[in-house]
Amino acid sequence: MGIRGMLRAAALLLLIRTWLAESNGPSPTPKFHFELSSSTPEVILDLFNCKNCANEAVVQKILDRVLSTYDVRLRPNFGGAPVPVSVSIYVSSIEQISEINMDYTITMFLHQTWKDTRLAYYETNLNLTLDYRMHEKLWVPDCYFVNSKDAFVHDVTVENRVFQLHPDGTVRYGIRLTTTAACSLDLQKFPMDKQSCKLEVESYGYTVEDIVLSWEDDNAIHITDGLHIPQYTYLGRTITSKEVYFYTGSYMRLIVKFQVQREVRSYLVQVYWPTVLTTILSWISFWMNYDSSAARVTIGLTSILVLTTIDSHMRDKLPHISCIKAIDIYILVCLFFVFLSLLEYVYINYLFFSQVPRRNHRRCRKPRRVVARYRYQEVVVANVQDGLINVEDRVEDRAGPLPDSPMQAHLASQESLGSLVFTSEQAQLATSESLSLLSSASSQTQLATGESLSDLPSTSEQTVPECTIHFHGFLTNDSIIPIKIHSRSDACDDEDSEESLSSEESHGHGSSHTGRLKLQISQRCVQEASWDLDKIEILQDDISITSSWLGLDEQCKGDADSIWSLTDEELMACDQEKDSSSESEENCSPSPGCSFNEGFSFQLFKPNRVPKVDRWSRFLFPLSFGLFNVVYWLYHVY
């Protein structure tokens, strides 16, 4: 048999093979199997088998055959074992992770693979690739995304669906879609947070009795190279699966989690550095003078305003949730430091502008009170009856004739007065007989004996003697008995003193002596003598009298000069009774008997601490803020 005969036999067999492939039912003729020799070329063998070749007619015949009896409403192996469906995902992009909406958008290719024996074919070994039009003719699993908010299938330029049919009936279904899935973000460490956004795949209607979902393999999730997520860095992914139970049955759920970490560099530039610089700016006030109220308060308030603006800007980008974020703590601490700087200045302002000026104001009022002491005096006269005439005679002998002035002071005897010291005071003492002649309307006090009262002229133009009298005490047979005579000005305000001065000037020279020296005499704390006046002996050298004559104008000028030339010690002595309580509270340390609150208040509000507080704040504030930053960043970064 030659080659020609072999070719004819091969052509005949090929025709028979084609006829058998095109027939719908089983062939009534028996199938022959030819054992060709090993020397037969492979081309001849391919002509007989035809597994790797297919034309349009062959594919059309295959599709027509498998779809003619195919029911799309029934799952594969209906009534039998559940259909295993394997799932794989190829992630092309993660476009956005929104903190406000708590979701993220992902674009991916979803592939599902299952086996449907109704679609098996044997005409060829080639896989058949079919487009989106087969979606309505074939059964597909009803998978959906559990946490999806919105999703759509891309349809540019055509609907992005594809089917691959294998000869054994395996179907691989792929779809390109974009979905927006919910992502529960944990913002407690914002913006140094790490998030895990998951995507859940589940069958909508088929329970585990019909469909069993599973991941294709351990590498079922594929990520495109160079995946870039805005404001985040991709860390990795994990895949899990679990069975969930509902009222309609149990379902298999596939879960993939994408781990991402937020990039903090943008927040360092936009939030942290401005916040730190603003906080440091508020500390400039510690180097300013403590009486620069406007500058220090302006810096503090401006810093608070800037921090509040930054905080409001951040809140607009974040959801309104109840958890406290790390950036909230940082901004709040910065606000607290700025507030402490303002509070520190309030403390200094209270010490400097409240405590110290009060003491200075009282010191400025002391000369006025000394003037008031000259004008308003209370003279307490002891009950002395004898010896006034002798003292008067001695005063007249040493000082000369008395001037014709209503302001002349007639001195009492040594037996009746003791422990009196009048320095440049024109307070006139009178006997008990002359006390009844005092007139409150004229406010003049004239102390003299009965013989001298009739001789005093009433003119105001005569000169007034200036007398300095010192009484040391009385000597009895047994001991020296001092007599206490209290001289004290009335507690009057500065406004009353000024009104008295103005009214005094308005009366003119006619009443100058009367207006300048108003004496209010009241018998306070009068010590009644319990001794016998006859036993009182005059102490020698106990009275020293200095007398001189001054004109009225010179005396007024001299009085004013003597008042304003007083030293601090004299002013303190003159004002000791008025300000004893207030001075002791501010300038003296609390006694051991004081309560704890008083001692603590004294230690806390000492005026001399004003410069020290600023010096301490220059170091304590930066040190505390630096320590806070170390703890803050170590906790949230590592």
Swiss-Prot record:
Residues 1-21 form the signal peptide. Residues 22-267, 315-325 are extracellular. The chain crosses the membrane at residues 268-288, 297-314, 326-346, 618-638. Residues 491-515 are annotated as: Disordered. Heteropentamer, formed by a combination of alpha (GABRA1-6), beta (GABRB1-3), gamma (GABRG1-3), delta (GABRD), epsilon (GABRE), rho (GABRR1-3), pi (GABRP) and theta (GABRQ) chains, each subunit exhibiting distinct physiological and pharmacological properties. Residues 492-502 have a biased composition (Acidic residues). Belongs to the ligand-gated ion channel (TC 1.A.9) family. Gamma-aminobutyric acid receptor (TC 1.A.9.5) subfamily. GABRQ sub-subfamily. Disulfide bonds join 183-197. It is a multi-pass membrane protein. It catalyses: chloride(in) = chloride(out). Keywords: Cell membrane, Chloride, Chloride channel, Disulfide bond, Glycoprotein, Ion channel, Ion transport, Membrane, Postsynaptic cell membrane, Signal, Synapse, Transmembrane, Transmembrane helix, Transport. One of its GO terms (cellular component) is postsynaptic membrane. Expressed in brain, lung, and spleen. This is Gamma-aminobutyric acid receptor subunit theta. GO terms for molecular function: GABA-A receptor activity; GABA-gated chloride ion channel activity. The keyword Hydrolase does not apply. Residues 289-296, 347-617 are cytoplasmic. PROSITE patterns: NEUROTR_ION_CHANNEL. One of its GO terms (biological process) is chloride transport.
